[in-house]
Curated annotation (Swiss-Prot):
InterPro entries: Nucleoid_associated_NdpA. This is Nucleoid-associated protein Sbal_2534. Keywords: Cytoplasm. Belongs to the YejK family. One of its GO terms (cellular component) is cytoplasm. Transmembrane segments: none annotated. It comes from the Bacteria. It is found in: Cytoplasm, Nucleoid. NCBIfam families: PRK00378.1. Its main location: cytoplasm. HAMAP family: NdpA. GO terms for molecular function: double-stranded DNA binding; single-stranded RNA binding. The keyword Nucleotide-binding does not apply.
């Protein structure tokens, strides 16, 4: 198992017969048995591997009421030993219930909260899970319908890096959260109940890094192959950081490039007008453009490795055309069969 579980608990928020949301609080933590360990380890791996997460911090309470400090205050009491985990999670459940009550669409769900350690960091994982119906076959071969937690489709989840939060009060990225489909951020109510404010535009930072790398190789005396090797090295480093759940560190990345004979990237990135943070989370989908070109439009989808540009793939911006030399075998087969049938 990749995590060490300290506490875990589940509370239920559901509608009563009058349509009002109510909390059903569990009076003690979940027993750290095999089922809990397997579930939380799976959730940790799934969450860590999710691309496109947002990052934020506990906001300062303002007149607009968007940064409610109640969750952060309760968490501070829990970490300071003035509040037990069960009491803290119960307060959090009631805060979420109050926030959900502001919306007509809410059906509630199961609030899972867990404190655990992974490598050298302490985390608080918070997720609102839903139940999903499924069928099973009984011993007598009859079918039976039951409900189970839908762990494969988590849309409302956040994770607080407690170690970073307590060590660096100026950090604006110790809370990560899942963004919804089509690039939308997680439902506002889930961030609001925690008093979380988005602090780091991860995609923008990764896009800026990519631009800095492109400018760096363009201004260098590297050959075409060496330039692509540089791009690949940057992507490899950033992918490793993403898989480890660690931030990209510009100085560390520059040292990696220096080991490959590509000096001065740090001075180049910091000396320009790139406005890059020293550290920020990786976004694979953005940085993948260092290795691949891809696009979709007008019923055409095209994707190819960057190293093929100018060789197997010729782009002419004047005529707005792309010439592909050496059509992929499976595509060639489809095209040949279609032409024979016409």
């Amino acid at each position: 198992m990749s995590i060490n579980i300290e506490h875990a608990i589940i509370h239920e928020i559901s509608q009563d017969s009058q349509g009002q949301l109510r909390c059903r609080l569990r009076p003690q933590p979940l027993l750290n048995g095999q089922a809990v360990e397997v579930m939380l380890d799976e959730l940790h791996q799934t969450y860590t591997g999710k691309a496109g997460k947002g990052f934020g911090y506990f906001g300062i309470h303002g007149d607009d009421g968007e940064a409610n400090p109640a969750f952060a205050n309760a968490l501070t009491q829990y970490r300071g030993g003035d509040l037990g985990f069960v009491e803290f999670s119960g307060q959090a459940s009631k805060l979420l219930q109050e926030e959900l009550s502001k919306y007509d669409f809410s059906q509630g769900g199961f609030l899972l909260m867990s404190c655990y350690t992974s490598i050298t960091s302490d985390y608080l994982f918070v997720a609102l899970l839903s139940a999903k119906s499924s069928m099973t076959v009984l011993d007598d071969m009859e079918l039976s319908q039951n409900n189970h937690l839908d762990l494969n489709n988590i849309q409302l989840a956040a994770r607080i890096d407690l170690t970073e939060w307590q060590a660096d009060k100026d950090s604006r990225k110790y809370i990560s959260f899942i963004r919804g489909r089509a690039g939308r951020k997680v439902a506002d109510f889930f961030l609001d109940f925690m008093g979380c404010v988005e602090g780091v535009n991860t995609k923008a930072q990764n896009k800026t890094l990519m631009n800095a790398v492109e400018d760096f190789v363009a201004s260098s005396e590297l050959t075409k192959d060496e330039r692509q090797q540089c791009r690949n090295k940057v992507f490899e480093y950033c992918s490793e950081r993403f898989d480890e759940g660690a931030d990209i560190e510009i100085k560390d990345l520059a040292d990696e490039l220096a080991d490959q004979g590509m000096d001065s990237f740090y001075d180049f990135a910091r000396g320009g007008s790139y406005d890059l943070d020293e550290e920020f989370p990786a976004d694979k989908s953005t940085l993948r453009q260092l290795k691949k070109f891809s696009g979709t439009g007008g019923g055409v989808t095209l994707s190819f490795d960057g190293g093929h540009l100018g060789q197997r793939v010729i782009y002419d911006p004047i005529s707005d055309t792309i010439l592909i030399k050496g059509v992929p075998a499976n595509l060639k087969d489809q095209l040949d069969r279609r032409l024979k049938g016409e």
